[in-house]
Amino acid sequence: MNKIALVVDDTSYIREDIKDILEEQGYKVYEASDGLEAIEMYKKVSPSVVTMDINMPRMHGLKAAQVITDLDKEARIMICSTMVMFPNYMKMGKEAGAKAFLSKPFDEDEFMNEFSKLFL
């Protein structure tokens, strides 16, 4: 498996925080700031994992997750959003193909614990 990650969030410091964590784990990290960028970047770099915010401009993260899952049934997507506290968003995330969910804000241990679920 390649160790390439795509971090998708419209907030730059969140992308940086996740990027730092994943680079420590040996991942090459690419970034996107909205769902449309995420889809284009996914097609270009074929990441092994994707972290995805929900509420973003241009395209909602759940829609982008669904498009990515349609492109690649084996996609490993983790939703990182304050929205996952709401059961309906978690349900929609699962329907869109997400395999792990993390509520913001989070620390590195919480992130890695949830991230590991992508590989179960």
Segments from the language model and where they lie:
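Two-component/phosphorelay signaling modules centered on CheY-like receiver
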Residues: 12-30, 96
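Acidic catalytic/metal-coordinating carboxylates
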Residues: 34-37, 60-63
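Conserved phosphotransfer cores of two-component systems
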Residues: 43-45, 67-75, 96
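Active-site residues of response regulator receiver
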Residues: 53
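Receiver (REC) domain active-site loop signature in two-component systems and cognate sites
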Residues: 56
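Alpha4 helix (beta4-alpha4-beta5 surface) of REC/receiver domains from two-component response regulators
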Residues: 63, 84-102, 113
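Hydrophobic/aromatic residues positioned on beta-strands within the core alpha/beta folds
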Residues: 80-81
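C-terminal output helix
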Residues: 106-115, 119
